[in-house]
Amino acid sequence: MFLLPRFVLVSCIIGSLGFDNPPTNVVSHLNGDWFLFGDSRSDCNHVVTTNPRNYSYMDLNPALCGSGKISAKAGNSIFRSFHFTDFYNYTGEGQQIIFYEGVNFTPYHAFKCITSGSNDIWMQNKGLFYTQVYKNMAVYRSLTFVNVPYVYNGSAQSTALCKSGSLVLNNPAYIAREANFGDYYYKVEADFYLSGCDEYIVPLCIFNGKFLSNTKYYDDSQYYFNKDTGVIYGLNSTETITTGFDFNCHYLVLPSGNYLAISNELLLTVPTKAICLNKRKDFTPVQVVDSRWNNARQSDNMTAVACQPPYCYFRNSTTNYVGVYDINHGDAGFTSILSGLLYDSPCFSQQGVFRYDNVSSVWPLYPYGRCPTAADINTPDVPICVYDPLPIILLGILLGVAVIIIVVLLLYFMVDNGTRLHDA
């Protein structure tokens, strides 16, 4: 009987040490309340339309195609749709949000606004944009696009100043110079309106450098003024460079209201599209899967830069993207990462997704959900353990101390009895 508690304790410890519950490199969900934003690698409609039944084109398991939990468009991305005429209305809602897109705007596309511009600035813009998207989708359920109506009282129209290859910027819109202005040293305004959403992500952009036109250099200056609250948001050019600069964007999170766009120099810019954020939720980190090309094309790491704990978990493959349909579609590593969407998981962390909530040899960093902090094992050969690790250790120490005390007492009484017998 004395040995039974120690046997149970030892069995529990052995069972706990023998149970393997490592974090897995997948994206998953706690329950059915989830949504995925993607591109061709998760665009079921694209596969059905152009490659019937050839689902090797995707990294997504085709069993998820009828789930109604995916908004994806081949050849597009949320960033691309936000800024350019090549538009797809990404729309979705869920408690747990997953992103697997972004590859359709990379250094491979080499976009820059002007011939002497810089694609590096646009990669910086991409990182800043996705930072706002990821942070806000950790606290909002719903994402979609909305048009932003504006009123400009002049006669000039918007102009396609910023374009490269097939990409033409239309958000923000550039209002051309009025015919009666001899240069770009003028102030001009336009009203725009935000309504129908809880909050909005809108661009505020300037050329951060000396912009040359007809032998004159100009410093860009743009402001948005909230006429309801009196709050003003603004950017002024601070760089003195004349080449190698481009369109620097900040991404503001604004409430509904009436706004005034103001330009003090160069061309007026006005937002035409916004990310519509709706339905506040309890904080739930988003999950982002790296979106990159095969190494034959140049990619960037901007989604990784944007995805930081505690609001975001980033998942990536350790090998080059090598597809089975073509080199850029149907990679085994990324298919494995997305396979976690086929089942529920209790715990998410920076290291990965835990399949069980009982015990693990890896302590979860930035945990979310029901994460493994105690043993709870029930196998045919091992009794159920209901101890946290610390009490188990303390109990072992106490048992050891008790054994030592018992041995000391036994020796004491044996010596004492021997002395009494000798005296008798």
Curated annotation (Swiss-Prot):
Virion surface domain ranges by topology: 17-392
What's an example Gene Ontology biological process for this entry? fusion of virus membrane with host plasma membrane
Listed EC numbers: 3.1.1.53
Q: What do the Gene Ontology cellular component annotations say?
A: host cell plasma membrane; membrane; viral envelope; virion membrane
Q: Which residues cross the membrane?
A: 393-413
Q: Which Pfam families match?
A: Hema_esterase (PF03996), Hema_HEFG (PF02710)
Coiled coil (UniProt feature): none
Q: Where is this region: Receptor binding?
A: 128-266
Q: Which HAMAP family match?
A: BETA_CORONA_HE
Q: Which organism is it from?
A: Bovine coronavirus (strain 98TXSF-110-LUN) (BCoV-LUN)
Q: Which InterPro entries match?
A: Capsid_hemagglutn (IPR008980), HEMA (IPR042545), Hemagglutn-estrase_core (IPR007142), Hemagglutn-estrase_hemagglutn (IPR003860)
Its protein name is Hemagglutinin-esterase
Role this protein plays: Structural protein that makes short spikes at the surface of the virus. Contains receptor binding and receptor-destroying activities. Mediates de-O-acetylation of N-acetyl-4-O-acetylneuraminic acid, which is probably the receptor determinant recognized by the virus on the surface of erythrocytes and susceptible cells. This receptor-destroying activity is important for virus release as it probably helps preventing self-aggregation and ensures the efficient spread of the progeny virus from cell to cell.
Which residues act catalytically here?
S40, D326, H329
